[in-house]
Amino acid sequence: MARVKLIVNRDDVALKDHALFEELAALRGRISGPSTIVLHSPGLARPWNEISEFLHRHSIVEPEYAELAVCATARERDCGYIWNAHVPLARKAGVSVATIDTVRDRRPTAGLSASETSVITYVRQLIQNNRVESDVFTQLLQGHTPQWLVELTVWIGRYQALAGILNAFEVTPTMLAEELPAVPRAATAAAPVRAPLGAPRVTPITRRDQVQERHRAIFDTVAEGRGSVRGPFGILMHSPLLCRRHLDVGTFLRFNSGLEADSRELAIIATAREKDCPYIWAAHAPTARQAGLSAAIVSAVRDRGDLAGLPSVERDIVDYTRQLAQQNAVGAALFDRLQGRHGVPWLVELTCLIGHYGIVASVLNAFEVAPAPDAEPLPLGTTRKGT
């Protein structure tokens, strides 16, 4: 049973949001899944939904590979809802039963096609290691454009974000057709997390003349808000229409949500830590201090330190981020404290913020975008070795 009321009927939202409800319901015939949670924050619901609509309607990633990536992400994030919803779509797109079983059971990919192996390995490495090795990245890029691989990466990041919502709020399928069993990962030695490579794996888009005329308004919007196009946007601009939708979500979460500045920045740096993303850390650790977070809090996040000595508000936000990343679940006591302290819309926005910056980290980590050499460093430790 879900931890909060699911918004499934028009009367579940305020009168002023009825039109929004009907607009979103018309897209799929009903409100279901993550939307039943995200609609607790109506201002976020439309931009949040538009990323999924773009991916499903306009992405150049072939359905076979998109759905395989989604199923592999559901497996890595232990999300039964996404698995149940997307296994039938994967079969319809041409993914074989043997391939789906390999993903479900966490088996080695021996015997699968080279393309299937590359997609599954890409998902596993990106989620388990927060890095993708060069041979896997290169094999996927061969025969495809940077736009294709950017969009595949966002498919993975997006469904990690959706899994975070569904797992945290304990949303389960109404009708279970495809069960996702608990399957432990094979025991492997912890592997060191390497620093980003010296240069991005594709040429970032940082100049207006790199963009087709019809998409230059999107480039201009990014540049006006940040002074230049850099970091994740230099990669996302390989898919300009997707970049615009990503920008809209980030703008709401950073400037229009109910999250306080210190809570928002704390969740962002905690996500950067869990994702081993030096770029996000360098960009937001100074902002976190400016928002009022103490040096002790920032250090505890950076060093994966004990949270016992932190104030309860900050401790719970960091713990929530850690549990989602490490356990694919959130303990009931922690969830109840956050909901009781802040309310459901706030908690929805926090969860979406963590997911949004998870997408950013996926793009930065996969495409090897490093911060400036003199930026504040993020020490890197060890992680599982995804294969």
Placement of each model-derived feature along the sequence:
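Hydrophobic alpha-helical segments
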Residues: M1-T387
